[in-house]
Amino acid sequence: MHNFLISILLLSSLFTSADEFSVMTLNAQNLFDIKDDPKKDDKAYLPIELKQSERHINSCKNIRVKSWKNECLYLDWDEDTKNAKLKNLANEIIKYDEVGPDILALQEVENLNILTQLFKLIQPYGYKDLTLIEGKDYRGIDTALITKFKILDSKLHYISFTGKNENKDTR
């Protein structure tokens, strides 16, 4: 993410006549839509009616952390809950300078669908472009940029970690 952000900042600075631009990084803390995506580990972030199958319940029972297991089983991630999260995020973003930062880097975004929903909420403040970078996080959550500049290209620069401190990829 660090190299990615630096690349975007350098490219953006070439195309702006302003002396300054602002950057905000924000962990969206599990920004999920309400659709079940079989390619993502989104089982905690679904409407309660999608959590009633035996398959879902058994999958949740394999979760070791009690609070995560309870979210998987009982959290009702419905349209109202998702919209409240989007509204709260948009309000936090716009608080910066009353119009939001020029470049917004987000972590923990599920997919382009939910990113686009956030983008539409803050677009009236001058935002012009967005990109989602599909990573290798085991849960399937990704990083994203929303910017007041046009994005020319985006690319994941994967860094492989090896050795005794090797961990699985996360957001």
Language model: regions and residue ranges:
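A generic structural micro-environment signature
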Residues: 7-10, 34-38, 115, 152, ...
